[in-house]
Regions:
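Long, contiguous amphipathic alpha-helices that act as assembly "spine/axial" helices in icosahedral shell
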Residues: 1-9, 33-49, 81, 131-154
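Alpha-helical scaffold segments that mediate packing/assembly in large oligomeric complexes
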Residues: 1-34, 76-77, 82, 160, ...
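Extended alpha-helical or coil "stalk/linker/tether" regions that are enriched in polar/charged
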Residues: 13, 19-71, 91-95
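Sequence/fold signature of self-assembling virion shell proteins
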Residues: 58-168
Length: 168
């Protein structure tokens, strides 16, 4: 999704305080809503370290700021939160990450209906850093290739916050 976002919707994090975090969320929501994104099925995506920071964040009275982030189905601003290590947490200074907000109704996954299958008895492969010959080992190698693609119907339907240092 990172590279499908409109340039105007890719912004740098405001900082690490609770107010900065709120501003990050506000910026992302404003980016989508100001672009007339329908917000039919919006969702947040973040690295586990960022989620764990939010679930433990407290105000000056000791109250949880985001209690809805706790539990099996975390929510943020009434939208579901999906956690993945596919979002790096070693960017920028080495501990920065990114945060995504996208209207998933505009996400499209394409999948080719054919599956390419090849068999070859003369191919080679690497096993434990040693080149192995299927021919000399009396083996047949089989390869299956499925084709997939992902796109957003509208670039404005994705907002990315970069340089996210909170929770590092």
């Amino acid at each position: 999704m990172r590279h499908w976002a409109a340039a105007a919707n890719i912004t740098i994090s405001n900082g690490t305080t609770s107010t900065d975090i709120e501003d990050d969320f506000k910026d992302m929501l404003n980016g989508l809503e100001s672009s007339d994104v329908r917000m039919i099925r919006p969702a947040w995506f973040m690295h586990p370290t960022r989620k764990n920071h939010l679930i433990n964040l407290r105000d000056s009275n000791g109250n949880l700021i985001y209690p809805e982030m706790r539990g099996a189905n975390p929510m943020l601003y009434t939208f579901p939160v999906f956690v993945t290590t596919s979002i790096p947490n070693n960017l920028g200074a080495g501990t920065d990450s990114e945060l995504y907000l996208a209207d998933m109704v505009d996400a499209v996954i394409g999948e080719a209906t054919d599956l390419a299958i090849d068999a070859d008895a003369s191919a080679s492969y690497v096993e434990n850093a040693v080149m192995q010959s299927a021919f000399s080992r009396d083996e047949t190698l089989i390869r299956a290739i499925a084709r997939h693609d992902f796109a957003m119907r509208h670039r404005e339907s994705v907002s990315v916050k970069t340089g996210v240092a909170w929770g590092a």
